[in-house]
Structures are given as structure tokens and as C-alpha cells.
Curated annotation (Swiss-Prot):
Annotated gene: rpmJ
Annotated Gene Ontology cellular component terms: ribonucleoprotein complex; ribosome
Top-rank taxon: Bacteria
Biological classification of the source: Bacteria, Pseudomonadati, Pseudomonadota, Alphaproteobacteria, Hyphomicrobiales
PANTHER family per UniProt: 50S RIBOSOMAL PROTEIN L36 2, LARGE RIBOSOMAL SUBUNIT PROTEIN BL36B
Keyword Translocase: no
Full protein name: Large ribosomal subunit protein bL36
Organism name: Azorhizobium caulinodans (strain ATCC 43989 / DSM 5975 / JCM 20966 / LMG 6465 / NBRC 14845 / NCIMB 13405 / ORS 571)
Length: 41
């Protein structure tokens, strides 16, 4: 999982990326390509 300050650029890297809020953190998850997983930090 990548930890990035800004997720906006990562969101457009794959069409299946989803922006999700969990426990006050913002995540990008991707069911088809797991390598695009990221967290804002």
C-alpha cells in the first residue's frame, strides 16, 4: 500500500479505483488490480 499526501493523481491511474473513507482516513481500493491500493497520510 502506498502512503501519499494527495490521492487525486493516483485515482486516475486505473478505471476501477474507488475512493473510500474509513475511520477518518481516505483510501483508494481496487478490486481488480490490488497494486493500486493507497492511503492518504
Amino acid at each position: 500500500m502506498k502512503i501519499r499526501n494527495s490521492l487525486k493523481s493516483l485515482l486516475g491511474r486505473h478505471r476501477d479505483n474507488r475512493l473510500v473513507r474509513r475511520k477518518g482516513r481516505i483510501y483508494i481500493i481496487n478490486k481488480t488490480q490490488k497494486r493500486y491500493k493507497a492511503r492518504q497520510g
